[in-house]
Amino acid sequence: MLTIVRGPVGSGKSRYCREEIIKVLKEAPLGPMVLYIVPESATFENEYLLNTREDLPGSFRLQVLSFSRLALNVVREFKAFFKNSSEFVYQHTLKKILQENKGKLQILQKAADNPGFIEDLLKLFKEFRRYRVKPENLEKASSEIENWMLQQKLKDVYLLYKLYLEKFGEEYTSEGLLEKFLEYAPKSKFLAGAKVFIDGFYTFTPLELEVIKTLLKTCAEVTVTLPTEYDPGIFNRLYSEALNLGIKVKELKLEKIERYRASELLHLAQNYYPLLPDPYSGSLENLSLIAAANPLEEMEKAARIIRYLAKFKGYKLSDILVLIPEDGYYISNIKTVFNEYGLPVYVDKGLAFDHHGLYFLLKGVLGEFNREAAINCLKSGLLNLTADEVFALENYLLSRGLDGEKLVLKEAWEDPNSSYWESWEKGFGEIISFSQILPLINTYREFSQSLKQLLLKIGVPRRISDENGERFWQAFTNLLTEIEEVFGAERLNPTTFAEELLAYLAKLSLKTIPKGLDQVRAGGSKRYWTGEARAVIILGAVEGKFPSPPAAGLIFTEEERAKLKKVGLELSPLIRQRLKEDNFHVFLALTRARERVYVSYPRVSLTGESFTPALLVDWLKKAFPNLKSEEGSYGNETTPQALTRLLSREMVKVKKNGELPFIAQGAFNALLLSKPELITKIARAFATNPGKIKLNAGFKEFLPSKTLSVSRLETYYSCPLKYFLKYLIKAEEREIFTPEATEIGALLHGAVAEIIKTVREKGQKLSTLLAEDLKTLVYQAFTKAQQEYGEKFLATYRGRYFLNRLYLMLFKAIEALAYFEGFTKFTPFGEEIAFGEKERLKSPVFEVNGEKYTLAGKIDRIDVYENNGKTYLRIIDYKTGSISISLDEVVGGINLQLLTYLLVASENKELFGENLVPAGAFYFRFQNPMLDEKAEGLSMEELKEEVYKNFRLSGYALKDEESLKHLDSFYAQNNKFKTVNLRTYKDGRIDNALTPAELEALFTKIKGLITEAIFKISAGEFSAIPYQLKDATGCRYCSYLEVCRLEEQEKQYRVIPRKKDPEVLLALSGGGVGDEKLDSRTNAGYHLQG
């Protein structure tokens, strides 16, 4: 007998099955089997639901099974041959079949080399078996299809599928098991007289329908449940099959929807399918639409909702179901977020092998042995090294730039007798030996056995202590054994095979079951969820994620599948049908809860990509006109981790009334890790000043020393939070060897200083040296600087290549400096001259609120020229990067260094004399300029002139004729400059030339800026307010973006007006901007060190 139970979602179809099962077992605890067949993902939960029923008598009759587990039980009853190869063996065998028959393929020959083609082909073959497609069906279809391209593709697929089945036809994949079930079921005692309940399905594949047909012929009674909202012809097919078999059919309709305790949820269930649903006018206490800034905030809101429901509404955690998109971010992070809120959660996803240490070890062992491979091995935690040794060795490898052959050469290490080398030998001796023999391996058996032996020698099984690790180890060793058994003495390319094996392991996952009973359940909306939930929370309701778009057809396009269907070759549903299925999944998600539904969507991704709410959101607003998107928070925070996360983000939001503090997300976490004692003070500061963004006076003890550098002050004006993280928290990136600008700069600065010093001490001039002498001088200075600053560059080929480039850059720069020296009366006074406490140059002292702060730094080069009792000063600062400077940047505080150095030098009258004239401050850029096509046809001298134009000094000069003509003698004769970037006009104007009054006004402004920065730093003002000057911002190239993570719409910029130099000077012409007001506010003062 066949009973078809039909009814809408929530009408109690599953409850009917369970009640009937209990009724049957109560009537007869002994007898034929009672089988409850449900989707694979629901077997555990349904078994638990039935076995925890107090009214269920003990019985051996009941089994809760999936279709494949049912088939397995029947096949085992006959002790039939059973073998199930791994997915990897299927893929690799299919790859070998493709390689051997590639020349016979017409259409798929080129596609065979595409990444993922093997996986797609294997999925297609599994689809064939589910839909009972045999090679002869493909051959028949190819003769009936008129389209030549499809005809040839069918012939290609026919050939490969035929060979695949010859290899694996007898193996029991899940599809193969069902086929074997059809063979053994009619003779099965296990099924004889059984009562079967098939529940939780809304459609069946042809193979599953054939299984049901066999059950009808074999078992006493079969009951199938079907939803009325979605029926792709299944009811009629079951009905007609039963009638054809002469089996009585009973239809039971459950029309009353009993699930919902909230009227709005009942309205939702009854009105989902019409495009224009009836509007609901009642209260909306149990239906919520939530908008979040991003997926992370969305998950946190969900966690707070769950805490609220558990604390105030009496929900058990198992009463709550969270449905999430099946893309990586939600699946990967929801457990971490919920755990921070003290919520145990079962996430319906497999255990990913590539998250375990064993994978990292294999990745290091099987790939090319280099620094990255070594670090992967260290990350595994499976080497014979302590945690301290692993940490120290990883940092050593990264900071020293050791790579390639240098890793295994003892003499290449900085100190071969140190503990680093001992740790290296202890941890990597066996791995290095294996990496040397790996390319020599010839067969699959050798590969498998050698890899097993290595892992045993390292002691991997002893160090895997976690339950998941043991499962991964067992799965991997089983795979190696299978490879050895299946492929044995066949020859292989070990490098290619290792890459293929790693690619497979990266996608491998193991099934999980819930470890606890009272925990939140989370997973994809397309999964079958057993039983009713009191509350459902849907996350990620945006287009393209909820529901996820249907996958494109594999190998065959949608158009080709439609043509195949016309000639009788039925495969999985076309996209139109799959879209209907997806819509039904959305409906199931919405109607799973009996009391509350929360639908949530993020506005943007964590990378700033905008999202469009899903069609579901629009439908809900039509069905419930009073439903509004809620932006607020939910519940109270009770865990320290959650509170820290919440505080850090709430501080970056700016309320419309401007009351909320503005500080970057992640600052508190950084504080907690670096200086726990700061947390209390920060909390107290914000608690006592909720409307401000200042840390209280107690923070002065944690401020850096009262000696400040100009570059630090520029950092503060770039973004106060950046200053806070870099200099107070001292949050640093791990040291990794790369030719950074700081190291390049140190090497070049050191070499130039050595050259200028050598020439000055010998009483010579660069401009008078012969070309060979200049070359020798540059080589000697570069070699010396390389020993002091460039040792790391020698560690790698890339580093040595950079050294060669730097040498050429230095030589061209010295040639340019020598050339420029012939046009100026200024001569070097000193190189790398420091100012500050006990330094050659006295430092400015700034008094702020009774505290003294000293400026310190180092000037790359000071040149002087003496004439008529006056001493003219010129500052040169060497740069390896951009050398642009404008006065709006100076008064904005982000480019203070050059003119501040001139200010410091010009106030050291004890050293240079009373009649001191600041003649100018300039950048000189190290570079390797290239000439364009305009240079064709120029003489050698003209080419040199073109090259030297690129090296001209860039900055500001004093607008004083006496000073200018000695600064560049070419100007005195030609009224234009050759060595500096000053541009002259016929009316006497000179760009970048400042009158003494203008220069003095700039100096006053700079003093005010330094004073104000000191005041704000000492007052604890570290808000996340980066500067913005036209398109440039303080966030550009910032190392702390991952800590800050301010959303673009949340940023509050300190806008520096874009002004030309004359406009800035005009604004300063009144004697500075706001200096008197500043002094009044900060009680500031200024003087030179005494």
Swiss-Prot record:
Cofactor(s) demanded: Mg(2+); [4Fe-4S] cluster
Molecular functions per Gene Ontology: 4 iron, 4 sulfur cluster binding; ATP binding; DNA binding; exonuclease activity; helicase activity; metal ion binding
Assembly information from the UniProt record: Heterodimer of AddA and AddB.
Residues that bind [4Fe-4S] cluster: 719, 1035, 1038, 1044
Enzyme Commission number(s): 3.1.-.-
Cofactor note: Binds 1 [4Fe-4S] cluster.
SUPFAM superfamilies: P-loop containing nucleoside triphosphate hydrolases
UniProt record similarity statement: Belongs to the helicase family. AddB/RexB type 1 subfamily.
Keyword DNA repair: yes
PANTHER family membership: RECBCD ENZYME SUBUNIT RECC
Transmembrane segments: none
Protein name: ATP-dependent helicase/deoxyribonuclease subunit B
Miscellaneous remark of the record: Despite having conserved helicase domains, this subunit does not have helicase activity.
Hydrolase keyword on record: yes
Known function: The heterodimer acts as both an ATP-dependent DNA helicase and an ATP-dependent, dual-direction single-stranded exonuclease. Recognizes the chi site generating a DNA molecule suitable for the initiation of homologous recombination. The AddB subunit has 5' -> 3' nuclease activity but not helicase activity.
Any one GO biological process: DNA recombination
InterPro entries from the UniProt entry: ADDB_N (IPR049035), P-loop_NTPase (IPR027417), PDDEXK-like_dom_sf (IPR011604), PDDEXK_AddAB-type (IPR038726)
Chain residues that bind ATP: 7-14
Gene that encodes the chain: addB
Keywords, ordered alphabetically: 4Fe-4S, ATP-binding, DNA damage, DNA repair, DNA-binding, Exonuclease, Helicase, Hydrolase, Iron, Iron-sulfur, Metal-binding, Nuclease, Nucleotide-binding
